[in-house]
Design a protein with these regions (language model features):
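Residues that define the transmembrane beta-barrel architecture of outer-membrane proteins
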Residues: 6-14, 27-29, 74-80, 129-135, ...
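Detector for outer-membrane/organellar transmembrane beta-barrel domains
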Residues: 69-106
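Membrane-embedded beta-strand positions of outer-membrane beta-barrel proteins
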Residues: 31-35, 80-82, 97-101, 137-139, ...
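Early exported N-terminus immediately downstream of N-terminal targeting peptides
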Residues: 24-52
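Extracellular/periplasm-exposed beta-strand and loop segments of Gram-negative cell-envelope proteins
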Residues: 1-8, 42-75, 106-136
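Short loop/turn motifs that connect adjacent beta-strands in outer-membrane beta-barrel proteins
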Residues: 21-30, 89-95
Length: 175
């Protein structure tokens, strides 16, 4: 059991670059390639803390001597999706949707927790897989969108850690 607290987990990101290729004369169908930098925080329930022991095996331990206020895994990723996009102009804005595969490069992971106001880093090595593959997409209108991303490869090295496949759903907007 991963003891995930999904309602408290979150991520934020910024689009670094985008490149689009139209596949038809009316510019309604195309391929879009993006580069996004994303910071992710996966929170855990109760007194559970993600840790790596001296045999380099990652798992959960329960803190029984203190009340853990917050426990989470955080990491950065560079996400590079290649998506097939369809768009349709309505008034002055476009209705658009896209779906396709994505690759992410993950690094700088930390398992941290709080007891009262004191923050502790449990480990900086949770056997994070450095490369991940996803199915992802979005749909939107104008400057607002709803996005989703679902891993098809595990977040952690399954030989040394619990098997988990992250899923993200969120809102995006253009500045």
């Amino acid at each position: 059991d991963l003891h995930v607290k999904s309602s408290k987990s979150w991520e934020w990101g910024i689009g670094l670059a985008s490149c689009d290729f139209s596949l038809n004369a009316s510019n309604t169908l195309g391929v879009t390639i993006n580069a996004q930098l994303i910071n992710i925080h996966n929170h855990f329930q109760g007194n559970w803390i993600l840790t790596t022991d001296n045999t380099n095996t990652t798992g959960f331990r329960e803190e029984t001597n203190n009340n853990v206020r917050k426990s989470y895994l955080s990491y950065w990723e560079l996400n590079i999706p290649v998506l097939m996009e369809y768009q349709y102009k309505i008034g002055h804005n476009k209705l658009y949707m896209a779906i396709g595969p994505g690759m992410e490069i993950r690094k700088s992971e930390h398992s941290r927790y709080f007891i009262e106001d004191d923050k502790y880093t449990e480990t900086s090595d949770v056997n994070l897989n450095p490369i991940g593959l996803n199915i992802q997409g979005y749909c939107g209108y104008g400057d607002m969108m709803i996005y989703f991303r679902s891993a098809i490869t595990p977040l952690l090295n399954s030989n040394k850690a619990p098997k988990c496949f992250p899923v993200s759903i969120g809102l995006g907007f253009s500045l």
